[in-house]
Amino acid sequence: MGEHGKSMKTIKGPAIFLAQFVDKQAPFNSLDGMCKWAADLGYKGIQIPTWESFLIDLDKAAESQTYCDEFKGKINSYGLEITELSTHLQGQLVAVHPAYDLMFDSFAPDAYKKNPKARTQWAIETLKKAAKASKWLGLNAHATFSGALLWHTWHPWPQRPDGLVEMGFKELAKRWLPILNTFDENGVDVCYEIHPCLLYTSDAADDLLCVDLGGRRII
């Protein structure tokens, strides 16, 4: 059997990211409601946004195998599997340019708003918790955003000085290395979802491939 045939054998069915459907109205305001809704539509997997506390208690998930077993069991009871945990909002807060502080503050808990340094540290610690929770849940991949320090330079005037992009990616690597180390320790791959404000040209993608991330490959 060829590689294509082998990969087809591992496909279990469609999965869905719950974040886009969260609402104050049932069935989109509870874990049970969303699981039943997804299962009834024929989905086999769900990606769980960790910033929605009614879906998952990330603090407990990072510390308790019992909590994770019960959490996973509930989801499995609907014929669903967890594909990944998601920290898209928290990951974006790892690296926020000051020009966007006000807009991104809405992603953070009230205790960390209007305090960029504390907000960044909270985001980093949250990502580390997600790494541990992923391990307890038996997951080997995690979905997130990297943050974007250079979006304000997309079409600059005057032209950005030489070395600015490299400096931005170097700072991004500095902030992410401790997080990546934690995911490594827990046997979980980090999967960056690339939006236009993160890697906006092929040149920017090439620049990212040159970033020193402790010998890791960015695919």
Language-model features and meaning:
Residues 23, 197-198:
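Glycine-/small-residue-rich active-site loops that bind phosphorylated ligands and cofactors
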